[in-house]
Amino acid sequence: MGCRYAVLALAVAYFAGSIAANDSQIVAVKGPASIRFTPAIHVVRGRFLRAANTADERNEDRGINLKSMPGFEKIASLFTKKNTPGPLLSWFEKKKSPDYVFLKLKINKGKQQLFDHPDWNVWVQYTTSVVKSDPEEAMIAALRTHYTDDILSKLLESAKNVPKTSGLATKMQMEHWVASKTPSQMFQFLRLDKVRNGVLDDPTLSIWINYMKLYNSKPVNKKQQVTLVSMLTTHYKDRGVLDIIEAAKKVPKTAPAARQLEMEQIQFWLKNGKSPDELLTVLSLDKAGNQLLASPRFKFWSKYVDNYNRDFPDEATTVMATLRNQLGDEDITPILIAAGKVPSTEKAAAKLQAEQFKSWLRENEDPAKVFQLLKLDNSADDLLGSPQFKLWGKYVEDLNLKPEHNDLQVSIITILRKNYGDDVLGNMVLAGKKAPSTSFMARRLEDELYKGWIAAGSSPDGVFKHLKFDKAGENVIQSPLWGLYTKFLEHYYKSFPTPMMSALAKGYDGDALAKLLIAAEKIPTSNTLATKLQTGQIQRWLDDKDQPGKIFKALLLDDMADDILTSPLFNTWTRYLDEFNKKFPDEKVSMTDTFRTSLDDETLKSLLITAKELPDMKTLSTKLQTVQIERWLASKTSPEDAFAVLALNKAGGNVLSKPLLNTWAAYLESFNAKFPRSRVSMIDTFREFFGDKALLTTLAAAKEVESTKKVATSLQDSLLSKWVLAKKPPSGVAKLVGTDEAGAKLLKTYTTKYMERYGQ
């Protein structure tokens, strides 16, 4: 029964407190802590004895003595004439709505401001007593039936500026907003949709958050709860919210709020079932390129993937699977490679790449494709040192270990040869051997290369071309790859014992090949093989029964002039000549025959000159001299011409010391014997080419040299005899021999001979 009079009791307490406070204008109001006070009402005092008595009678009937309540008498006097505590109790008993009481109290009438009405506090207290759950909401609902939203907003805003009414007005204003605006409208009303990255630092955000809390507290909104992140997403979209969070994180003041918002955003996405694939695009990570793993958003996204898998186990995925799905192996692979080179992202890249390789292995991805995805097809300079190459090699090994690949083994060298020329691979091997970090891999690659050539059926001449030796010319021996090739030949001929010269013979003409082998003999690493190959070359010629003269020309010895006898090719040819004569004794060929048929006079002369000057060529010199003499005799070459051919006419004072003088002397003797009617003397030839005066000087000098003294003396005697026969007077000779002691002596000798012959 006491409940029926609660409103009156509250009114009594309310006004009793007002009186007890004497002149105080503030009375306590039930409400949240944020709104602790509401202004007292100013009323016209009057008498309401009847109302008081009526109430008294009713209270007595119900066992409640209102008069016994402190201050009741004075409270009753505060009501207007019509609005006594009696009617208030009656309204309460009949459960009249706050709107009904509002009209009865005529608060919307009069000249006073709403909050200054004499019965405003009575109505507030009545509403608070009647509506226990949310009295402010009930007040606003009642007020909205009597005022437009604009007018009501102005009234509330005006009341907020008055200290005695600001508390309640603020609370009611919030209720008014909740009643009149949707969360989105309120967000726009506060212009928070225009702030963008600075929204978390905007003072008005706290107003909206209080609004949001009040809005969410309403039972009617239980199923449509609003959050800050949902509202930000509505107005700024996902990417805009991300920008807001990232900007706020950089400011110490807003960093905590940003981190909290970030967590709420994750939960918001999870609640809405946003997949990692969708979020990857939202975060623009699909366009991050090589900066993907370094992006703070990537770490954020990675955490989201974990949370997503927890909440949606049936749709669980991995970071790598999503990246491959969104970017494709073609794009993500180079990103991981680049990230692996940066210390800050190296570990993350290695982890993701390990997942990628597992995926490839599970899918039986073609190693050749993986090779290209890893950009190994364009890494010749540092392939063996590349971490990616090692990973790829391990992948091939793991793939080959799978049972389904027992009959489909993948060859590393086959893939390498498809992407790089053998010459490039060879250079990789050589370079790799020099570095400790790659030497093991280089040796392994070298063995694989040999095996690959043999397995592919590559012949020596094929490998010769693969290594580009067919374009190296005579410099092939200088190629760093030469040792690699010779080693291959050793491997090859162990498996296929065929003539070793086939490859070289197809790649080079006879002379070039011979030069090649001779050069190879001088290189320690290929000396032994070169000797074998040279033997093989000679054997090849013998098998073909090539004439020595043909080989002589094939080796271009007939074009070497002065260099024939000093050329290593000449030794090769002489070896072949000996082997030919042994194998075909009935068809023996002499060296002189070859010289005779292969060399012209000029070349033979040069050859003869060279042979005369080389100590170890005495026998050959004799043979060459014979050939030369026979050729001159056959053509009836005059001794004078032969003298000139041998360039003795240009020897000047050194003519008697020239080895070729002996050759010419031998020819002169043979010529005179064969053609006695055309006999030529040595002295006549000397006189013809040098003249008497110059000849005398030459002979005089030669007589002082032991090796030429004899021939010089003989020629001098012949010259004197020629003068005697020509009746050259001593006086004329005196002009030639000079006045020195040697000249005087020679003149005396001549005069004696002259006198003996002519007696004058």
From Swiss-Prot:
Cited InterPro entries: PexRD54_WY
Q: Which GO terms describe its cellular component?
A: extracellular region; host cell
The places in or outside the cell where this protein is found are:
Secreted; Host cell
Q: Does the keyword Transferase apply?
A: no
Q: Where are the WY repeats?
A: 87-134
Where does each LWY repeat begin and end?
135-221, 222-312, 313-403, 404-496, 497-584, 585-760
Description of what induces expression: The expression is highest in the biotrophic phase of the pathogen.
| Assembly notes | Interacts with host dsRNA-binding protein DRB4.
This chain's function reads:
Secreted effector that possesses RNA silencing suppression activity by inhibiting the biogenesis of small RNAs in the host plant to promote enhanced susceptibility of host to the pathogen during infection. Interferes with secondary siRNA production by associating with host dsRNA-binding protein DRB4. Inhibits the host salicylic acid pathway during infection.
- Annotated family: Belongs to the RxLR effector family.
From the Swiss-Prot or TrEMBL record, give the protein name.
RxLR effector protein PSR2
Q: What is the lineage of its organism?
A: Eukaryota, Sar, Stramenopiles, Oomycota, Peronosporales
